Amino acid sequence: MAVQTFPNEIVFFDLETNVPNKAGQHFHILEFGAIIVCPKKLEELESFTTLIQPKDLSVVSIRSSRSDGITRAKVTNAPSFEDVAEKIHGLLNGRIWAGHNIRRFDCVRIKEAFAEIGKAAPEPSGIIDSLGLLSDKFGKRAGNMKMASLAAYFGLGVQKHRSLDDVRMNLEVLKHCATVLFLESTLPNHLEGKWHTSSKIMTRSRRNYQIAQRAMPYSKGSLEKMTQNVKNLLSKAQGNQTLQSLINHSHSLLR
């Protein structure tokens, strides 16, 4: 039976893992979350998330510094990676993979996890890593370019560090960045270089709510309205426009 692929669909995914703090300790996937996105409308079509029980529960902290963080108790009765591997493979294989810093982290962890259970890892039809992408195209407007900083820059709230919440935030960040770049390319004499924040950058150790206090080049919530207005205009003008054609107008944002 041939494996079904979806080369034009985008799957945003994110992994939550333990943080190795001992020599010889490895990463273990503790949570997987993904959304499948329509490339024409940039809308969520399907979602899936699951906690995952590692083989060694001692790698998971008993307590979490976050109110909704992952603790040992939460993963004790969760399925193993092998239990959910088929579902994860079906979501990822043959689609365009998207995420923040996925080339260096999430993609590697997925391959390791499938290798550990002796099964073939899913393969992407393409990869969109928003960290490198936005660092190159959007510059350092949001400081250190972490997802928390980008979300704060656009007034999208505080990053929760839970897989499904993070991928949805990732999609919204890309929409906002693409809108800004599209407008700058359309009206370069009026907008380009004038939307940057001040040169005063918060230190990486400051909390997300402090980052959110950074002076913004627009009133809170106004960019979200502008984003929707631009999407509506594009929809009316080019109802069948795909993600790729939108990006081509935004300095080839995705490549």
Curated annotation (Swiss-Prot):
The enzyme's E.C. designation: 3.1.11.-
Main location as per UniProt: nucleus
UniProt entry tagged with the keyword Metal-binding: yes
Record SMART domains: EXOIII
Alphabetical keyword list: Exonuclease, Hydrolase, Magnesium, Metal-binding, Nuclease, Nucleus
Swiss-Prot/TrEMBL cofactor(s): Mg(2+)
Active site: H161
One Pfam family linked to the record: RNase_T
Induction statement: Regulated by the transcription factors NAC045 and NAC086.
GO cellular component, one term: nucleus
Domain Exonuclease per the UniProt entry, residue ranges: 11-174
Function: Probable exonuclease required for enuclation of sieve elements.
Protein name: Protein NEN4
Species whose genome carries this gene: Arabidopsis thaliana
